[in-house]
């Protein structure tokens, strides 16, 4: 199944891309996708999006098809889904 991932803010700057499409096996969760992306993009990306337990960091906002996700392990992905990963913008 094909999943489109959109990156915003610091994640986009870290990767140097704003979007990519990934082919996954059927029956994958958002958490599975995040682990796949962490392995694909290396340690800097992994440190940015994962916490010490290997879960999505609380500092990263995730949405699937424009609906914000609170727990990445509870969301099953479907062919054609669009996932957005972003770090909140802060400062003053």
What are these regions (language model features)?
Residues 1-91:
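Ubiquitin-like/PB1-type beta-grasp interaction modules and other compact soluble beta-rich domains
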């Amino acid at each position: 199944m094909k999943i489109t991932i959109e990156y915003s803010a610091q994640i986009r700057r870290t990767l140097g891309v704003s979007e990519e499409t990934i082919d996954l096996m059927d029956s994958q969760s958002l958490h599975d996708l995040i682990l796949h992306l962490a392995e694909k993009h290396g340690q800097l990306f992994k440190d940015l999006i994962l916490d010490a337990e290997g879960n999505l960091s609380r500092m990263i906002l995730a949405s699937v098809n424009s609906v914000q996700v609170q727990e990445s392990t509870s969301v099953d992905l479907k062919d054609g889904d669009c996932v957005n990963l972003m770090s909140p913008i802060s400062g003053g």
